[in-house]
């Protein structure tokens, strides 16, 4: 599943081709995505795109008339292509521009979304209760300490909770906890400010590095020009269960936590 870095890499790739361009057509070949593509999505036709933003794992395409909200789901991708590029399997939506280019949405598993909203995005049910962006100043040790107060859940589950901080998915939660030396099953509310400070630093550094590397390609993700991300080459624990720890040589442990694969080093990461 594309996580925050992959979505941000996609945003950076498509934005230069969309901003200040006028939409002349919206082609919906298959409206049966995670949520049906609404008829109102066609309201973007005739509008000029003002900006392309990211909130958590959602891409927001802004116009004066409203916002197109795009989620890549499990296997979605967006590509900038010449208009009339032949349609391939799983090419569900084309956003056609006046300059002869188009934005194409491909999603084999159809867990993605293409929605339309006319009110400020803060009021949309998908966006209204999201926590702070991890790369912003709003995500800081004191904010995290306050958000975790009294919580008995495992820290990894809290780190992946979009109400606490957005966009830290399974890959990067594993990596950040390893880098901070925190056991993923540690009771969140009992972690002291010193460890949380280090965790915040590592989350920010790892996400920023992943964006710089073009994201992490494990199976489905390619960026806006069809190229893979290269951060997978820098993973220390995710996908490395039973292999040697890159720091101490101990065999990494693999467990299921919140129905997600969790890999950690029992020596380097303490409760």
UniProtKB/Swiss-Prot annotation:
A zinc finger (FPG-type) spans 236-270. InterPro entries: DNA_glyclase/AP_lyase_DNA-bd, DNA_glyclase_Znf_dom_DNA_BS, Formamido-pyr_DNA_Glyclase, FPG_cat, MutM-like_N-ter, Ribosomal_uS13-like_H2TH, Znf_DNA_glyclase/AP_lyase, Znf_FPG/IleRS. Its EC number is 3.2.2.23, 4.2.99.18. Pfam families: Fapy_DNA_glyco, H2TH, zf-FPG_IleRS. GO terms for molecular function: 8-oxo-7,8-dihydroguanine DNA N-glycosylase activity; class I DNA-(apurinic or apyrimidinic site) endonuclease activity; damaged DNA binding; zinc ion binding. The active site is at residues 2-3, 57, 260. The keyword DNA-binding applies. Keywords: DNA damage, DNA repair, DNA-binding, Glycosidase, Hydrolase, Lyase, Metal-binding, Multifunctional enzyme, Zinc, Zinc-finger. Binds 1 zinc ion per subunit. Gene3D superfamilies: 1.10.8.50, MutM-like, N-terminal (3.20.190.10). Disulfide bonds: none annotated. PROSITE patterns: FPG_CAT, ZF_FPG_1, ZF_FPG_2. DNA binds at residues 90, 109, 151. It comes from the Bacteria. It catalyses: Hydrolysis of DNA containing ring-opened 7-methylguanine residues, releasing 2,6-diamino-4-hydroxy-5-(N-methyl)formamidopyrimidine; 2'-deoxyribonucleotide-(2'-deoxyribose 5'-phosphate)-2'-deoxyribonucleotide-DNA = a 3'-end 2'-deoxyribonucleotide-(2,3-dehydro-2,3-deoxyribose 5'-phosphate)-DNA + a 5'-end 5'-phospho-2'-deoxyribonucleoside-DNA + H(+). Its cofactor is Zn(2+). One of its GO terms (biological process) is base-excision repair. NCBIfam families: fpg (TIGR00577), PRK01103.1 (NF002211). Belongs to the FPG family. Involved in base excision repair of DNA damaged by oxidation or by mutagenic agents. Acts as a DNA glycosylase that recognizes and removes damaged bases. Has a preference for oxidized purines, such as 7,8-dihydro-8-oxoguanine (8-oxoG). Has AP (apurinic/apyrimidinic) lyase activity and introduces nicks in the DNA strand. Cleaves the DNA backbone by beta-delta elimination to generate a single-strand break at the site of the removed base with both 3'- and 5'-phosphates. This is Formamidopyrimidine-DNA glycosylase. It comes from Shewanella denitrificans (strain OS217 / ATCC BAA-1090 / DSM 15013). The gene is mutM.
